[in-house]
Amino acid sequence: LSTLHEQYPEDKKFNKVYYTIINPKSVTMGQLYGQFDPVSHEWTDGVLAISYRNYAAEPPKIGNAEDLKWVWFDGPVDAIWIENMNTVLDDNKKLCLMSGEMMAMSNTMSMIFEPMDLEVASPATVSRVGVVYMEPFRMGWQPCLDSWIDAFIELPASVDDEGNVTRPEDPRPWTITADQADIVRKLYGWLIDPCICFVRKMVSEQVGVHDQTLVVATLRLMESIFEEILVNSDGAGGAGMSVKAKDMSEEAANMITLRRETIECTILFSIVWSIGATGDEEGRKKFNEFLPAYLEDSSIIDKPEMKGVKTLLMLRSWESPMKKQYKVSNPIPSENTVYGYSYIPSNSTWKSWDEQIDRSLPSMDASFSSIVVPNVITAQLGVLLDLLITHNFTPLVCGPTGTGKSVFIHTVLNEHLDQNIYKPIQIAFTAKTSANQTQDQVDQKLDKRRRGIYGPAFGCKAIVFIDDLNMPEVEEYGAQPPIELLRQMIDNGGWYDIQEKDF
């Protein structure tokens, strides 16, 4: 609506939107609505009370009178906090605080709730709101890809009357051309749905995730590799990919195959370590048989043993974007499994993980419990973690207890990463860990730069490592406040100051 208002300022249907996002389970009830100090009996407003008052003020404190104001609750709905909202949601439209203050909602205000489910919401609450159910498969993964392409495709060139082509300055560190975007779009359309449907029907998944999450994981790996090629290596190892589009000279024309090859191999590597990485060992064996066979001949979907996969594809109304059999110019070598190689963009080759094992001896003064014996698994995990962390993505390492996850992540944080840039903040969750304790542990390790802004020393990046993520006690209605706090940090880039109530 804000974008439409900027484009059509005279159209009264579109108004600018101001909004506040609150995860109600990342703070306590007192911090949400407000509370009396037990010693001084002084009233302190909560996060919701402050935002509600600012939006409901007449004359408006924020924006103009016709601007829309949304209070957006992004978190679990339960009987602990939602019952206090009933007076807001009924005909009174008033927020009643324990201090005795009542604030009426303005005509331009709206309350929006975005929970995962309404399993523990009371009928009194549900009857007061309009419910819109977003089915997991309704949106699909295509908008994720479209959004990624829109974020990185180069700005269109302009042509003057004399035929001179000029391209506007682009502040982004790297972009892709329209031709490269077309290759990405076609390969995703050809590979993603068959791979996801195969995993859903034929593989026992250890981690159940939505299709969109799998595609976003693929995009993040692909983006990290592209950025590594185009920015960190100054384009030298990019196999023909360039940050800015150049005139199509003969030399540039000869590089198209290399550019296509780099995109193909990067997408294959990303699919293997996202969609193909959710299964158990037996499932990986099946995916290892499927992917090369599909790349060789996509008609294997029509075989009798693939009936379940084909049925699922038909339910998705999937059609291959390729009019004829597509041939990948540099497929994953068949000497090992698809999980046995990583892609090296600098020389456009596949390199066995065995060749990337660190064979150096441990330090003589290292404690026995801290020594990690390098193998293929540590090489794979090390490369993937380095790739994601250094490109500002959040990895989640899961597995059974006692498999060495914590020890290896400590090794990555303290040995693989540049200690002059990356500053680890390590937190171990317990059953009694609260959201406020988690917030305090992180804030204490950061410098306060100005009001509402915390961060590590200038020129450095803070890496927060949460050990035993699953440990916090589950509340009566199913929420885990420390995890909700982390989700708010990842989704919105911050949290509310416990004292000032600022975001």
Residue ranges and their predicted role:
Residues L1-F503:
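Conformational switch/transducer regions in large eukaryotic molecular machines and scaffolds
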